Structure formats: structure tokens, C-alpha cells
Amino acid sequence: MKNKVNWTWGAALAWSMLCGSVLAEPVARHITAKVEVENTTDYKNIAGSTARSKEQTRQLNVTLDNRDKQAANDVVVKWAIYAHKMETNKLVTVKEGTVKAKIEALSTTSVKGEKVIIKGTPKHTVVTRKTTNGKAQNSSKNEAATGEEYYGYAVAVYAGGVLLDETSSHPSLKIEK
């Protein structure tokens, strides 16, 4: 009799799991993300120095691939762009955002994050030249690094509140849920 009771409870559990998954809102679970970083970098010379200041523009282009046979209407892509402070080398989040997407069954779509501009100047020496009584004199002054420099990105893809895929330029970079 004991075996029959265990089988009945097992069957009830299996039935509830089957019915629960059939009746629940379907979540597309076969969505992957591929990230391309659109980037430009402009340099500006610093008067009296061989160093140059840097202005970096970054924008994430995320291609979502739905390999499921059902459309996904509730996809949320969370992204973040990171930089390091040039004076301390400390990692900081420059910008983060969220983009909603709909993906038809067995198809791909692309979403873009916002454009982010990161500016920075490395530590450098500025040399000035003065002429006093017909003699040239050079003086130099050390300038500290300022601003930030691009480090990387992280992207996480959710559907129905479930994490489906995440990718980053460095393994240590993760999106907080």
C-alpha cells in the first residue's frame, strides 16, 4: 500500500508541474545576445606637451536572436558602459540603461543603447618657454591625469523577469538585476 500512495503523490506532483507549466505565461528561453560596440575616438593636442586628451564615443548595438518557436514580447535588455578614472584607475559605471524589445519567433532584432561620451587626459608635463633678457628659459609643470577612459561593457537579456543571456567585454563586469 505504501508504494501505491507514493506513486499517487508522485503522479499528482508530475501532473501539477505539467499543468502549471502549460497554463503559465510562456517565456521564450532561447534568446541570445551578440554585442557590437560602435566607437570613435578623437584626440586633441595639449599645448606644450606631447600628451593628447582623448574623447571616446561608445554605443552598444545588441543583436537578439530568438531561437524559440514563440514570439517574445517582454524582452528587456539591460546594458552598462564602464570606464576607469585616469587619476586613480578606479572602475566606474559611466552610463547604464534599459531597452525593451519584441522578437518574432525564429528571428533576430537589434536594439541600441544610448551614445556615451567619455573624456580624459593622461598625466603629462607641460613645458613653457620664456625669454628674459634675450635668454630662453624653459620651465615645466606636471599635470595630473583627469577624466575617464573606456574600459568595457556588460549586457543582460531578460524575458518575463528571467535572465536568458548575459555577455560582457570582461568577465568581471556584470549587470545587477
Which ranges hold each PLM region?
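Short acidic, flexible loop segments centered on an aromatic residue
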Residues: 74-86
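Bacterial N-terminal signal peptides that target proteins for export
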Residues: 1-11
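Short, solvent-exposed, Trp/other aromatic-anchored flexible loops in extracytoplasmic proteins
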Residues: 97-167, 171-176
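Sec/Tat signal peptide C-region and signal peptidase I cleavage site
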Residues: 19-24
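Contiguous beta-strand segments within globular domains
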Residues: 51-64, 72-74, 117-118, 131
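Low-complexity, acidic Ser/Thr/Pro/Gly-rich terminal tails and inter-domain linkers that flank the onset
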Residues: 25-59
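Hydrophobic beta-strand positions in extracellular immunoglobulin-like domains
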Residues: 64-66, 81, 157
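Acidic Ser/Thr/Pro-rich low-complexity disordered segments
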Residues: 86-101
